[in-house]
């Protein structure tokens, strides 16, 4: 799958580091971007999953937009 085409990378400079090979018995660990930088716990996706896991939370938060709209309509000055 990983075939190197020299024609595709004509501008790429090949240095000694590109031909690096591990020493016998040396351990190589390739970490993905997510493993190196885990998502913060305050991200919207993680809080959304917590709400979906708890039935009471999902029910109460579903009513919040309607409640907020009702309060806004009460406190808005009419012109």
Swiss-Prot record:
Disordered as annotated region, ranges: 1-24, 36-79
Keywords linked to the UniProt accession: Host-virus interaction, Inhibition of host innate immune response by virus, Suppressor of RNA silencing, Viral immunoevasion
Pfam families referenced in this protein's UniProt entry, alphabetically: Gemini_C4
GO BP, one annotated term: symbiont-mediated suppression of host innate immune response
Compositionally biased residues, Low complexity: 38-47
Ranges of biased composition (kind: Polar residues): 48-61
Top-level lineage group: Viruses
Keyword Metal-binding: no
Family: Belongs to the geminiviridae protein AC4/C4 family.
Function in brief: Pathogenicity determinant. May act as a suppressor of RNA-mediated gene silencing, also known as post-transcriptional gene silencing (PTGS), a mechanism of plant viral defense that limits the accumulation of viral RNAs.
Protein name: Protein AC4
């Amino acid at each position: 799958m990983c075939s190197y085409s020299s024609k595709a990378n004509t501008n790429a400079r090949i240095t000694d580091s590109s031909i690096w090979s591990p020493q016998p018995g040396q351990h190589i660990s390739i970490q993905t971007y997510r493993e190196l930088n885990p998502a913060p716990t305050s991200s919207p996706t993680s809080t959304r999953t917590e709400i979906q896991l708890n039935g009471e939370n999902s029910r109460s938060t579903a009513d919040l937009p309607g409640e907020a709209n009702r309060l806004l309509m009460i406190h808005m000055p009419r012109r």
